[in-house]
Amino acid sequence: MTDETPKTEVVQDPVSGAVVPAHPVGEETALRLTLTTPLYRGATIAMFLSGLGFSAAAPQIASFLVNDLGASLTVAGLYYLTALTAPVAGYLVGARSDRTGNRLGLFRLCALAGFLGWAGIAFSTQLWMPFVISAVVLGFAGAATSQLFAALHDQLAQTPRASNDGVVAIVRMALTAGWVIGPVAGAFLAAQTSARVMLFATALCTLAQILPLGALKDVPTSVPATAHGATAPAAPGVRVMAPLLVFTALYICVYAGESIKYAYLPIYMNDQLHLAPALSGAIIGIQPLVELVLMPVAVVVARRTGMMKPMIVAAGFGVAANLCFALTGTAAGLFAGQILMGGVWGVFAALGIIAAQRLLPVAVATASAIFLSSTALSSALGGLTGGLGAAAFGLPLVFLIPAGFAAIAVIGLILMARTKAARDL
């Protein structure tokens, strides 16, 4: 007798790795789950505030150093190197979080550090003060985001669902939405008041991250407590962390082009192509809009194909985008490049943090911190090679450098996809 019982289609939950039904009966959608779960809802609002505050200050800080504190353009440019302490601070916070399981407590401390840091910069009277504050205090403040994603992972892993990856994508989309609005809001506030007021507003946004989470506590995990004489788990060794470190290095190659693009694409559009300001603004602004649209699409595709294939394609988009910047010489070509870059970040923004946590499941806070803080290294790499490339090749051929970095990422991701660690993604 033939068994005609219908087979249930299954997928692998990218957060927990569990195999779950693709379309379970009564399954809550990711949006509904986010809205009805206090942690997910609070994390979404917190990440929007984080992106809003930081992106408001980032484009204005150099002008503040020059106009308010008397820095030269060269010295002001060196400020961005202070972010190089972020990976070290992020690793220390992440390792502490994995030993204790205290995700939300550390998140609140990091957010408080961010408030104190940005407020300190806003009230700085000497040029050295923002540099020291950024290197020491804001390095730890940046770990707030990684702790929140680690807390999300812990709760999502408690109940494997096909919609879990969608929850992470929604929270990540909120961070991106903050980055879309922040630069405009920051420029407007600075113009209407002053750079110091805008920087203090950034401090308030950073502190306000704490409010949506209220008094929520961490979800109990298998991490043993260190109190009462219990032995803390050993930090993962380099060999265990190797897949994560390789993936992060390839991500740095993809991301390095962003600092080059934002430094030289506006100059290229204004000084050589002589594009109208409105057209230049539209070219810059199209990328985050495409990114927001494609993030949920990337999640759906990854459920069917695994994460590596979309990320390989996205890195390929990075190659094509930078070739458009370097070789087309037209507004249409730059639009195409920015749309392709939206595809790059639509995929990596949605899937990158999940992949990083899956590559080091024994220490998800450490994994989150290493991955998210790596943008500081990529910005430094892009700034250094972009400066040398602009001097050697000029504009627009400097964009061949990030095209080369993205090509390295494509090759590396293809090779990594063949490893056991990546096949499980």
Regions found by a protein language model. Name each.
Residues G77-A95, G285-V297:
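Central cavity-lining transmembrane alpha-helices of secondary-active solute carriers
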Residues G26-L84, S259-Q272:
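Helix-loop boundary and gating motifs at the non-cytosolic
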